[in-house]
């Protein structure tokens, strides 16, 4: 119950075998966790053990939800820095949505403290919101995610991890037009153009205005091929 992200279904499984705390959880065999809680549960266990998994984690659970989460290299207390991270997570998750030709109508955002820091207050804040219309636009999803973040951010507290979860996934082919959406067609064409650029030149060649250009560049440099530009100024900006 003291671990964020376990979920009610897995919590019941753990309670049945006498697991009641994070300490109990990390003592379970890896193969049991993977068999009963999937690879997602195993990644959570490794994280609690202090063993790093992927820097940015994208998860797709039977097309019911898509999550992008990350533990930061250092604690963050600035709202602006958190906005930059959440925006990047939204972009990554949105691209995954488009790849599987889906849209979402609900978003959840969370931020939490460092669970391994001794003598430190443990806290996490999360908020889920329903979208006024289904979308897979990076622009729309990041905008709504930032609003959720602003509602759970507590000034003066430090955060070590954050994440965004896209839920209420539906096929893009059955999109229902809403009174509240104005730029769907324009966004669809823009997202198609961005995805084409990403597929041709590599990820993060086009970024949103609220993303940090130097950080994106640093994240992607180790994966560059000789065909990629080496000029940071060539990264396109979408505002």
Regions found by a protein language model. Give the residues of each.
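DNA-contacting surface of Y-family translesion DNA polymerases
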Residues: 2, 10-156
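Acidic, metal-coordinating catalytic segment for phosphate/diphosphate chemistry
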Residues: 131-239
């Amino acid at each position: 119950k003291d671990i964020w992200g376990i979920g009610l279904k897995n919590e019941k499984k753990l309670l049945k075998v006498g697991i009641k705390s994070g300490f109990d959880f990390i003592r379970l065999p890896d193969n049991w966790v993977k068999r009963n809680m999937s690879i997602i549960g195993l990644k959570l266990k490794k994280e609690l053990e202090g063993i790093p998994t992927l820097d940015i984690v994208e998860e797709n659970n039977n097309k019911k939800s898509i999550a992008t989460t990350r533990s930061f290299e250092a604690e963050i207390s600035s709202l602006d820095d958190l906005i930059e991270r959440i925006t990047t997570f939204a972009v990554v998750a949105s691209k995954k949505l488009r790849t599987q030709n889906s849209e979402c109508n609900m978003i959840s955002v969370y931020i939490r403290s460092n669970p391994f820091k001794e003598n430190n207050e443990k806290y996490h804040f999360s908020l889920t919101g329903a979208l006024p219309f289904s979308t897979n636009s990076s622009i729309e999803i990041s905008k709504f995610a930032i609003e959720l973040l602003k509602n759970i951010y507590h000034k003066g507290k430090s955060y070590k991890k954050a994440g965004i979860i896209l839920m209420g996934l539906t096929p893009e082919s059955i999109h229902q037009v809403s009174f509240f959406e104005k730029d769907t067609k324009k966004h669809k064409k823009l997202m198609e153009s961005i995805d084409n650029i990403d597929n041709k030149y590599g990820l993060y060649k086009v970024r949103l205005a609220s993303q940090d250009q130097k950080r994106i560049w640093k994240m992607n440099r180790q994966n560059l091929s000789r065909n990629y530009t080496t000029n940071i100024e060539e990264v396109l900006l979408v505002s």
